[in-house]
Amino acid sequence: MEEEGVKMDVKLLNVSDQEMEEMRRNVFLTTLEQLKAWARSNSLWPLTFGLACCAIEMMGVGSSHYDLDRFGSFFRTSPRQSDVMIVSGTVTKKMAPIVRRLYDQMPEPKWVIAMGSCATAGGPYVKSYCVVKGVDQIVPVDVYIPGCPPNPAALIYGINKLKEKIRYEAKTGKKVL
């Protein structure tokens, strides 16, 4: 098996060449961190935090047509049971401390998806005195999904990108910004 340019060869006693070839095809070697990341990436539990129009599109992802459950994601209503916060809609300065409190109540590891133009950059209300110019000013964001509003397929794509990010960070040990 080759990993990062290093060839790993296992020498076993009393094993025939045929058995060794069978083991190479059927034995999977990994690290515990990669195994945990694989499990976490395939069982994301998003906290629904709908603030505006994008929330309606987010609800569509849970319907039978898109069926987010088939990807191992189940919407949770409590931050203590969630590991992904999906912020969909305009975040006002009055709502900002509540968003931060919900984020702080989530257990580690935790991730944030900013869904829609309003959550990512303030949207059409960006010049208003009471609108936060992107949820990344309150909590760290892992995935941005553009659109006004983004369709459910875009949210599924964003969730899949988050899964890839989780696995990549565990494999390389590098934080992806």
Curated annotation (Swiss-Prot):
Transmembrane residue ranges: none
Q: What is its main location?
A: membrane
Give the top-rank taxon of the lineage listed in the UniProt record for this protein: Bacteria
User: Which cofactors must be present for this protein to function?
Assistant: [4Fe-4S] cluster
Cofactor: binding comment: Binds 1 [4Fe-4S] cluster.
A GO term, aspect molecular function = 4 iron, 4 sulfur cluster binding
**Could you tell me where this protein is found in the cell?**
Cell membrane
* Catalytic activity line of the entry: a quinone + NADH + 5 H(+)(in) = a quinol + NAD(+) + 4 H(+)(out)
**Its membrane topology:** Peripheral membrane protein
Amino acids binding [4Fe-4S] cluster: C53, C54, C118, C148
Gene3D superfamilies on file: 3.40.50.12280
**GO cellular component assignments:** plasma membrane; respiratory chain complex I
PANTHER family named among the record's database cross-references: NADH DEHYDROGENASE, NADH DEHYDROGENASE [UBIQUINONE] IRON-SULFUR PROTEIN 7, MITOCHONDRIAL
In the record, the note on similarity to other proteins reads: Belongs to the complex I 20 kDa subunit family.
Subunit description: NDH-1 is composed of 14 different subunits. Subunits NuoB, C, D, E, F, and G constitute the peripheral sector of the complex.
Its name, as the record gives it, is NADH-quinone oxidoreductase subunit B
Give the organism, scientific name.
Anoxybacillus flavithermus (strain DSM 21510 / WK1)
